[in-house]
């Protein structure tokens, strides 16, 4: 396919509209974080705007990088020094744009991290709830599983071992989930009457909460649970604008 040249700002306006980005009070700016020096024909997507992803994008002759975890987070030192300075120098010297969408990409009902993870894990009857600003989703397994078999299913589908705490017996059918670092929503998930709650990370207190709530909790990886939304958005943009697109996986066990 011959890629079509696109003004990056046209693409940003489209993304802002599709993802309803203005609705979210986020922890970092959504949209165009660093403006490159040329029109967009080749797009690389990835989870996090790390040095490894930037270098991989440059090797692919990308004009822009699309990520879920970008730069300029609130309460973070804004100065471009140390590794942040090195990342910025590498990106700017290559003339590559950086595009990031955080909460809007978590929440989108088709392209978002929660929606795409649910499909990846073969959940059915999926829908967002009113809890956690709509970021907490609920659904069912097509067939009930034991906690052990559910853990194995998730591990296989995500190609990463999931860590289980809390409930060890009984049947898992109704599931709540929220990608990334959302273990703090465990009590809200339990209030939905689900058998299991899945997110990316595990905190010290999560183990005790899961046990006391009688809930099966799976920590399936922050990175692993947030790989699929940015892939879906990148693919959608490639089809919409006639771009060349490739998702680059930078392994992260966290």
Curated annotation (Swiss-Prot):
InterPro entries: DUF34/NIF3, DUF34/NIF3_sf
Binding annotation for a divalent metal cation 2: 69, 222, 226
Binding site for a divalent metal cation 1: 68, 106, 226
One GO MF term: metal ion binding
Keywords from the UniProt entry: Metal-binding
SUPFAM superfamilies to which the protein is assigned, alphabetical: NIF3 (NGG1p interacting factor 3)-like
Keyword Metal-binding set for record: yes
Cellular component GO terms held in the UniProt record: cytoplasm
Highest taxon listed in the record's lineage: Bacteria
Residues annotated as transmembrane: none
Family, per entry: Belongs to the GTP cyclohydrolase I type 2/NIF3 family.
Subunit structure: Homohexamer.
Name assigned to this protein: GTP cyclohydrolase 1 type 2 homolog
Organism: Allochromatium vinosum (strain ATCC 17899 / DSM 180 / NBRC 103801 / NCIMB 10441 / D)
């Amino acid at each position: 396919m011959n890629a079509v040249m696109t003004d990056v700002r046209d693409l940003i306006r489209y993304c802002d509209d599709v993802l309803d980005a203005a609705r979210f009070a986020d922890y970092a700016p959504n949209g165009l974080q660093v403006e490159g020096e040329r029109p967009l024909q080749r797009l690389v997507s990835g989870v996090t705007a790390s040095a490894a992803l930037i270098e991989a994008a440059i090797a692919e002759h990308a004009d822009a990088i699309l990520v879920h975890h970008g730069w300029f987070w609130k309460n973070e030192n804004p100065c471009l020094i140390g590794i942040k300075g090195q990342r910025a120098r590498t990106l700017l010297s290559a003339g590559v744009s950086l595009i990031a969408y955080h909460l809007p990409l978590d929440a989108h009902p088709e392209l978002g991290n929660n929606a795409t993870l649910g499909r990846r894990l073969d959940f059915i009857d999926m829908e967002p709830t009113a809890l956690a600003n709509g970021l907490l989703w609920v659904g069912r397994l097509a067939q009930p599983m034991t906690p052990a078999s559910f853990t194995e299913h998730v591990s296989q589908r995500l190609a990463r071992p999931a860590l289980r705490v809390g409930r060890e017996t009984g049947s898992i059918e109704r599931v709540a989930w929220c990608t990334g670092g959302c273990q703090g929503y465990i009590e809200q998930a339990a209030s939905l009457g689900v058998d299991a709650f899945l997110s990316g990370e595990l905190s010290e207190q999560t183990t005790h909460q899961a046990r006391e709530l009688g809930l099966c909790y799976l920590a399936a990886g922050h990175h692993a649970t947030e790989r699929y939304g940015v892939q879906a958005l990148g693919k959608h943009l490639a089809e919409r604008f006639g771009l060349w697109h490739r998702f680059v996986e930078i392994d992260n066990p966290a």
